[in-house]
């Protein structure tokens, strides 16, 4: 099941304020039509825009990253007395290279359930991205719903992103990462079919991406939830689009800077292996396709909330 028409998406995505706006609501839900403004108004959109800076030539790793911020989670929980379930119509991931000679560079994105203690069962999907143009995209449409009253709702979709980083001066912004989501709250799964009648799991490599199977390397990456990049979040952005005969279209986004933090050197001494080390060991043509338990470092399962508490000079990328 294809989530988007690739040619139409690639044409639209560069002309929208948010990447997630390149996917229309009518593509996600069959009842999202012009004649049902209430349905269109209940489909919410949120996007995180992350600028990733270099770390003195080391490989870059962004781990345990939240799909939604606290403001969005609070808004969903306030609707729990009216709606029982939360459904993600689509999650869109875009990676943009902002450096010369980017063609052939690659990396990996792992999406997983941060509340699941079993990495294999909690693994949602993984993609290898390789720059043939300056942007790579993939999308996924989960089959399952989540509870609006789930105490661990913020943990249910987490991301780990590994970048192959060339040698640059520290804090040079090299990559832009856009993670957007369109979702709705419902009381019945019968409202979740697309306009083609599909309601099952879907994952699509839109441009420059290739799906990866779960393996030992991905397992160890999920277990190692330390983030050597310091996340610095700016003020949230509200995007309002005026519409005739219907309510205004309101979307939220957040801008985040990911760079080397004050504790990065300490984390490296604890055994963190950069992406550059993995690529050198396995070879670029094997990245993400091969795993060796004997070569993988012991994983530590710690949450961003524990390692980034106030007073330690870190942030988890969500609103205060």
Swiss-Prot record:
Q: Which GO terms describe its biological process?
A: proteolysis; transport of virus in host, cell to cell
UniProt-recorded name of the protein: Probable movement protein
Q: Where is this region: Disordered?
A: 251-270, 286-320
Q: What is its EC number?
A: 3.4.21.-
Locate the active site. 144, 171, 199
Which species is the source of this protein? Answer: Apple stem grooving virus (strain P-209) (ASGV)
Q: Which GO MF terms does the UniProt record name? A: RNA binding; serine-type endopeptidase activity
**Family listed:** Belongs to the tobamoviruses movement protein family.
Matching InterPro entries: Trichovirus_mp, Viral_movement
The protein's job, in short, is: May play a role in virus cell to cell movement by increasing the size exclusion limit of plasmodesmata and forming a complex with viral RNA to assist its movement. May also have a papain-like protease activity and cleave the genome polyprotein.
User: What keywords sit in the KW lines?
Assistant: Hydrolase, RNA-binding, Transport, Viral movement protein
TM helices/strands, residue ranges: none
Pfam assignment, any one: MP
- Highest taxon listed in the record's lineage: Viruses
């Amino acid at each position: 099941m294809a989530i988007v028409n690739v040619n139409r998406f690639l044409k639209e995505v560069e002309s929208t304020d948010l990447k997630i706006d390149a996917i229309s609501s009518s593509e996600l839900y069959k009842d999202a039509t012009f004649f049902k403004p209430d349905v269109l108004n209940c489909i919410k959109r949120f996007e995180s825009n992350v600028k990733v800076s270099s770390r003195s030539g080391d490989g870059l790793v962004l781990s345990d990253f939240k799909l939604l911020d606290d403001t969005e989670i609070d808004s969903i929980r306030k609707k729990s007395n009216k709606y029982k379930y939360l459904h993600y119509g689509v999650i869109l991931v875009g990676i943009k290279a902002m450096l010369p000679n980017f063609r052939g560079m690659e990396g990996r994105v792992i999406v997983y359930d941060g509340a699941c203690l079993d990495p294999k069962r909690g693994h949602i999907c993984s993609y290898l991205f390789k720059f043939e143009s300056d942007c790579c995209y993939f999308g996924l449409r989960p089959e399952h719903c989540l509870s609006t009253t789930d105490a661990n709702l913020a943990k249910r979709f987490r991301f780990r992103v590994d970048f192959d980083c060339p040698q640059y001066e520290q804090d040079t912004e090299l990559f832009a990462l856009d993670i957007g989501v369109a979702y709705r709250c419902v009381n019945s799964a019968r409202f979740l079919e697309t306009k083609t009648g599909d309601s099952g799991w879907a994952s699509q490599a839109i441009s420059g991406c290739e799906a990866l199977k779960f393996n030992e390397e991905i397992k160890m990456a999920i277990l190692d939830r330390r983030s050597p990049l310091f996340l610095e979040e700016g003020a949230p952005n509200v995007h309002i689009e005026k519409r005739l005969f219907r309510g205004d279209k309101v979307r939220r986004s957040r801008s985040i800077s990911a760079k080397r933090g004050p504790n990065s050197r300490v984390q490296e001494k604890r055994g963190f292996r950069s992406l550059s080390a993995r690529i050198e060991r396995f070879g670029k043509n094997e990245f993400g396709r091969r795993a060796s338990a004997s070569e993988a470092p012991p994983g530590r399962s710690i949450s961003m909330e524990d390692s980034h508490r106030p007073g330690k000079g870190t942030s988890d990328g969500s609103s205060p």
